[in-house]
Amino acid sequence: MIVQQQQRSPEWHAQRKLRLTGSRVGAILGLSPWQKPDDVLRDMVREYHGAESEFTGNPATDWGNRHETRALLAFMRETGLQVEQCGFFPYGDRMGASPDGLTSDGGVLELKAPYGLRKGGEFKPLAEQPHYAAQVQMEMLATGRNHAYFSQYRAPYGDPLSHDYVQEAMHIERVEHDAGWIDRVLPELDLFYKRLLAELDNPEHLEPLRVSIDTPEAGLLLTELDTLRQRQEEDAEREKAIIAELVAQAGDKNALVHGRKLTKTKDSKSVAYAKALAELAPGADLSKWESVRKGGWRLS
């Protein structure tokens, strides 16, 4: 018998160890805009050894957690369905998923409250979010259910009397189980799992990603750097103001200013080739045209 554990409880975390879960499968398949397969591998190794999670949350996850209950109530109000909250469903010996709920019509529910849409904007369909599509398919596979609801919720935002007040909104898609999905992705999941097992005893995953420097000397260097950056910003603003004043003196015409050319440049267009290729030739092998850009260091 499968015992359902409350989500995010110690027992729930224990059930998920060394399992390729619904929330991670999109990243494992290289579909996530936020995580790479190597990031998931490191997280899973650390989880296996009981190391502290390196992800402590961000505004997007905080927003989603804060509005989870409202999103659930709005879904039930909109659809008339009841939702039973649930825990982790294992699938086989190395996969599983934790949907946000089981619907009274025999489906599963995945709720999202997109942080990027909190102030308005259009909901993206699931077809444009393949990492979530993979999550939903894994949830149906693990629960043995044949359909799912992918529900996106936007909470009211701002002052109701203001012109820019954002009203509550919801976008719900019914998704059918794709019986061939697991066969298509299983080879890639198998490769990842073999890599995971091979890396379980690699101590690098348990070491900090960054060393910590708290010396007085480093503090002085940061202060100097911040001062330089502030000065650069101020210089850039002053440069724009000077150019604007010269343009005004020239009457918005090309001019010679003490022998130096003041020239109006024309608008130009550019093509986002990477985005165009991804849309026009998805999955194309571009390795022949790849080049290596030498890395460096940046301080943020």
Feature map (PLM): residue ranges:
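Accessory terminal regions of nucleic-acid processing enzymes
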Residues: 1-300
